[in-house]
Amino acid sequence: MIKSSQKTEGQIVPPFLKWAGGKRWLTRESEVMQMIPPNVRYVEPFLGSAAMFFHSRPTCALLNDFNADLIATYQAIKDDWKSVFALLQAHQRKHLKDDSYYYSVRSSTPNESSARAARFIYLNRTCFNGLYRVNRKGQFNVPRGSKDAVVMPTDDFESISKMLEGATLSHGDFGEVIKKCGQGDFIFCDPPYTVKHNHNGFILYNEQLFSWADQVRLRDELAAAASRGASVMATNADHPSIHELYSDFEISVVERSSVMSSIATRRKKTTEVVISLNL
């Protein structure tokens, strides 16, 4: 039986995905959240787990990500959340019965939209540390993790589907999305954190996906959108190269905990920046 613990009006729907660099922590920064203007079109070119979208609850939105499987998952929930949830429940039952089930799902390539979305969510919740990684062929290759929970008590796909009714979903380059923005738009950007001349391994991994040239292009697109009247907010690494790149923007430093470590005691406090214009 399909069952959804739908939230009452005004309650926050939490992200249903674990995502590296997710901004759920930022939604608890009241000074930052109060900067978001009301009655605007909400635009997010790097959607990820959509923490800011879910917390802000905009009635009109343009949501984009370069990850086609991610956007297809949101689209499937928007179109037919019941089918996605039913398939996720089936994954839960089979996962608990068979230790090899994870790898059979990982190697599968479903074409139907609900099945594709349920596979994406299942792998996100049961893979090692919620990591998203693909090989050169574009195949998801993260090993199974230690978590067995596929269906969560917080799952509320019905409310998510309703929230997405006012959203246009797209898959593509961030620049094409930002070019569409101007007066009456609020842009929130949470790009991969690539910095200039940094030799950290995670940053080098990101460099393959989002180069320093992309960082410069993002800055230019945001500045152009702001000149057209858009309100702009972006997050990034607290690094001298980022401060220099965004020297014509307002910059605030905020503290957070690194949450992607699988061992809580190894999670460290770090700082990031919130960059803004026209707010």
Give the role of each language-model region.
Residues 2-27, 32-38, 80-202, 217, ...:
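SAM-dependent nucleic-acid methyltransferase catalytic core
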Residues 45, 64, 170-172, 189, ...:
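Short His-Asn-centered micro-motif
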Residues 46-51, 156-157, 236-240:
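Short, polar loop motifs at secondary-structure junctions
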Residues 47, 68, 176, 193, ...:
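Short, glycine/acidic-enriched loop or turn micro-motifs at the edges of active sites
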Residues 122, 274-277:
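Short, well-ordered beta-strand micro-motif
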